[in-house]
Regions:
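Exposed aromatic-hydrophobic patches
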Residues: 24-26, 77-84
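Extended, low-complexity, turn-rich repeat/linker tracts enriched in Gly/Pro/Ser/Thr and Asp/Glu
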Residues: 41-49, 97-102
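Short, surface-exposed beta-strand/strand-loop-strand elements in extracellular ectodomains
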Residues: 46-61, 106-108
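Noncatalytic modules at the cell exterior or secretory-pathway interfaces
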Residues: 33-37, 84-103
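Aromatic, loop-rich ligand-recognition surfaces of beta-strand-rich domains
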Residues: 26-39, 45-48, 108
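Residue-level signal for short segments within beta-strands and strand-turn junctions
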Residues: 41, 55-57, 111-113
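C-terminal interaction-tip segments
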Residues: 1-22, 26-28, 95-113
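Solvent-exposed serine/threonine-rich low-complexity stretches and specific carbohydrate-binding patches
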Residues: 8-11, 65-74
Length: 113
């Protein structure tokens, strides 16, 4: 039996105020089957929009994971997105509605085999 494998990044995204859609860098998740992303707004303002984990088989055509959307990231709030990985590539996507001045959003992730 193979041991469970993990890959973590505590500094995947560190962004200031959101003023447009924001896409994280592509993560090659080929050997993994589950992903969790922790999205934290450490400031007091609330950027409004939806956050998603996106999936792709070819690193070109992306779809939003069903059920991964979370609305506004309130000041001081932590959101956890968790999903089974059925594609080779994954990334974070922020679908902008309106910005929260001085918001400081960070994203970390954990992949699990």
């Amino acid at each position: 039996m193979n041991p469970v494998q993990f890959r973590n990044s505590s500094d995947y995204i560190s962004a200031g105020a959101f003023g447009a859609d924001y896409t994280g860098s592509t993560i090659d998740a080929g050997q993994f089957r589950k992903i969790s992303m922790t999205v934290v707004n450490t400031a007091t303002n609330t950027p409004v929009g939806n956050i998603y984990i996106q999936f792709s088989d070819n690193d070109s055509d992306w779809i939003n994971g069903t059920g991964t959307a979370t609305a506004a990231i309130s000041g001081g709030e932590t959101n956890l997105l968790y999903f089974d990985v059925n594609s080779r590539y994954v990334r974070f996507f922020w679908d902008y509605s309106s910005a929260g001045a001085s918001s400081t959003v960070t994203v970390s992730y954990t992949l699990k085999s």
